[in-house]
Amino acid sequence: MSRIRANTETSETPADAPEGGPKLSPRSTKGVRTRERLVEAAKEIFEEHGFLNARISDISERAGQSHGSFYYYFDSKEEIFREVAISVDKALFAPLDDVILSDAVLLPSHARVKEAMRRHLESFRKEARMLSLIEHVSRFDTEVNALKLARHKQLTSRVAEVIRRLQRRKLADPKLDAEITAAALGALTHRFAELWFVQGAVDCTFKDGVEQLTRLFINAVNLKDPEPKA
């Protein structure tokens, strides 16, 4: 099996669920919106009750749908949880994509690193509950764990390429291995944010947290600000 079913309701099939064959795709505007409502409702239910205690019937009710209609869009609680995890992941890393990793940003400055860090930590703080659940579920759902590892690999690769660009322009320490540095900095940021926002083990203001992590990043790669264009 690719995953462990942690709650018997995940295999529950109500009388009005579609029988056999592939589930219907939400191709119409209404169908797309219904699917979005189910994902939004699932996120709320997971945050309120956790993964193990969340029920498909509660998700359907929160979304204003019948229990059976859920199965036109998702096969199980595990599947919709993965969809929620993907949406949270996109929100969490969008600041890095927009401010640092975009192809339009050739050389990130100190100010850009700080802004990306601020937005990233703000997203982490907002999504702390779901991120804690994703970490929990990834321990027994191999597909959720695979999603996490794939994102880590993708992000590490993109950050490494930024470091290489900086090294070629003599704006970062040329002795650093870009891949190892990117992986280490990513792990540092994620673990620090987890200790801070999920476990409450770090006591500092948001401003101080952003400033200190930014300084760590800049110092780690010996980042020099690009020369301003004339």
Predicted ranges, named:
Residues 83, 97-126, 178-185, 210:
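Hydrophobic alpha-helical connector segments
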Residues 30, 34-43, 59-60, 80, ...:
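Generic hydrophobic, amphipathic alpha-helix propensity
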Residues 37, 45-79, 83:
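Helix-turn-helix
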Residues 126-158, 203:
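Short secondary-structure transition hinges
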Residues 131-136, 145, 167-215, 224-230:
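Hydrophobic/aromatic-rich alpha-helical bundle segments in the mid-to-C-terminal region
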Residues 31, 39, 85, 89, ...:
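Amphipathic, non-transmembrane alpha-helical scaffold segments
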Residues 38-46, 120, 217:
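Short hydrophobic clusters on alpha-helical segments that form packing/core surfaces
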Residues 1-33, 225-230:
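N-terminal intrinsically disordered/low-complexity leader segments
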